[in-house]
Structures are given as C-alpha cells and as structure tokens.
Amino acid sequence: MFRHSKVYITRNIKETDFFKTTLEKVGFAVFGESLIEFSAVDFNLNLDVDWLFFYSKNGVRFFFNQLNNNQLEIIKNKKIGTIGSGTAQFLAENYNRKSNFIGTGEPMQTSRAFAQIAAGQKVIFPRAKQSKKSIQQQLSSVLTVIDLIVYENRPKSQIEIPETDILVFTSPMNARIYFKKYDLKSSQKVIAIGHTTGNELLKIGVQNVVAKHPSERGLAEAVLEIKIES
C-alpha cells in the first residue's frame, strides 16, 4: 500500500518492535536511530521515600542498574509511578516491577493525576541531567520532590540519517540535534511523540503533528494517518 515510502524515527529500534513491524507490513521502509548517546551518573540514594517516579526507559535502566542488592531489597516496598505505558512495560519486562501509577505520557495530565494519589508524600524522580523536569516542577507545591540525576545524554558526534518522507521525533533534544544538521525538505512530514517535543519543533520553526498517544502504536497510527492524508 505504501511501497517506497520511508520513515525515520529518532529511536533505536529492534526488528520486533511494534512501530517497525506494523509499518513494514504495509510497505514502509523504517529507519531508526537515536541521535543521543547516554552514560551513567553516580548518585547517592536516600530511600526514605514513598514513591519512585520514572520519566523514561533510560531513567529506569540507569537507576536500577546502579543499585546494590540491599537497595534493591529496600525498594521492593516502594510504590512506583511512570510517565506512560511504555516505561511501565519496560520496567515490568526487565526488572519485574509493577507500576502503581501509569500516566498518559503527557506531562500536564500525568502531573494532575499523580498529584491526586501522591500529595503530601516523598517522591524520588530519577532523571537525565538535561531533563526538562516536566512532571516534578508542577508537583513541588503538593509533594516532596527528591531530584536524582542518574544519567546524562549528549549529542552523538557523528550522524548520517537517510532522507525519508516522514520524520518522527521522540524527544526535544533529538529534534534540536537533527535540525542543526539537516534542513526540512518541502515534501517531508513531521510527527512529534508529545506536546513537549511538538512545542520544541515549533520553536525551531518546524510544523508538526502530535501523535494522539505517546506509544509505539500511537506513533505508527500517526504515520499512517499523515501518509493517507498527504
């Protein structure tokens, strides 16, 4: 149906990922590569808290991978919140931990919902050094925010991205890096995973469509919709 159509997503993808398999079934060539490289940041951990709240899969990975056995035992009794279903699924599949709260993926909606169940409690927010802190900034007046940097991200020194019909951006930083090197072609369409990334693209001067849901399924559906309409 969409033979010869090409899509690029700013995320490292596996052959079995839903985004890739769904679009390839209908003829798309799918390219995926993050424009960011990640590294762990050492941290001191105070576990006198009620909740852990994760913004991303990387936040989960760099937090849990640096814990010792004693710390892993202690956090079994802590409640866990995640910004969205993708992070919750990653947490369950890789660390056998169930999320007690799963957000919608959108910071404003997620903040309001989380505030209703965590008000007055202590919450650790493991994050990237360059994070926009989109959830915790909105919650500092209703709960005790414990900020914890567990990794840092920096632009890859060398990137070579093929020209495609559709560009899918999964973070503001990926968007900034891409458009520092490449210009938007008049024929290209742009999709953002959420409003934070969409607003960053607008600041750069790039019009975009925001996916209805910040998941692999939501992104794949956005690609199909934008291609059908074009």
Regions found by a protein language model. Give the residues of each.
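Conserved beta-alpha
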Residues: 1-230
